[in-house]
């Protein structure tokens, strides 16, 4: 799972990340004459308030994408178009101030060998709040029933003013599911969020 915003990153750490990792990377690309337009996703490890780069991806992360994009108020197509046309500075990107929490449901055994074609019962009975989302990742539908066919299967996302409320919303949905072949982590968002509480 994932959550946003991260309370791990404060202003000081953000400056370190920009000055030690992001800006030098962008300068190096420019010096090499490498024109790049798109996502640059930095996978970081933070040790003693120092950032270390683990990897770069030229795509959004999963489930980071599902967690962050629901907070975006600006039309995503307009952002992509501005990026392609090299005029990102001309558009204003607006975000809402909600807290976002994503819990990923996985097939038993994942990330190793996992069960497939296990029915996920009661999924069609879940009624989402207006600021909550359900993204399918590893499911198929057969005759009105849903079955798991992947490792990461479902993503429940909730936007709220408080992380605790977002967790409560997601837990409400999870309690309705009857899926013997699935599991999820219950500690997402607990470590760095003072307003989050145990289930």
Question: Where are the model-predicted features located?
Answer:
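Short arginine-rich
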Residues: 172-186
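Short, well-ordered alpha-helical segments
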Residues: 160-175
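Glycine-rich active-site loop/lid that clamps phosphate-bearing ligands
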Residues: 105-144
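Short, well-ordered beta-strand elements within core beta-sheets of diverse protein domains
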Residues: 2-6, 104, 152-160
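C-terminal catalytic subdomain
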Residues: 73-81, 100-114
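Conserved small/polar residues in nucleotide/adenosyl-binding loops
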Residues: 192-197
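Internal nucleotide-binding/catalytic subdomain
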Residues: 1-61, 65
């Amino acid at each position: 799972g994932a959550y946003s915003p991260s309370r791990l990153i404060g202003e000081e750490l953000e400056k370190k990340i920009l000055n030690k990792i992001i800006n030098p990377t962008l300068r190096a690309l420019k010096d090499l004459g490498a024109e790049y337009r798109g996502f640059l996703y930095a996978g970081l490890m933070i040790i003693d308030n120092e950032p270390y780069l683990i990897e770069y991806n030229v795509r959004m992360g999963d489930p980071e994408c599902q967690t962050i994009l629901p907070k975006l108020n600006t039309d995503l197509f307009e952002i992509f178009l501005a990026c392609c046309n090299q005029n990102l500075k001309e558009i204003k990107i607006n975000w809402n101030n909600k807290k976002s929490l994503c819990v990923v449901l996985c097939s038993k055994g994942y990330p190793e060998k996992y069960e497939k074609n296990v029915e996920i019962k009661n999924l069609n009975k879940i009624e989402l709040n207006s600021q909550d989302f359900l993204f399918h990742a590893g499911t198929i539908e057969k005759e009105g029933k849903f079955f798991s066919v992947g490792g990461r299967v479902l993503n429940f996302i909730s936007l709220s003013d408080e992380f605790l409320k977002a967790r409560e919303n997601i837990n409400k949905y999870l309690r309705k599911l009857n899926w013997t072949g699935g599991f999820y982590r219950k500690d997402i968002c607990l470590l760095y969020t003072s307003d989050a509480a145990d289930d």
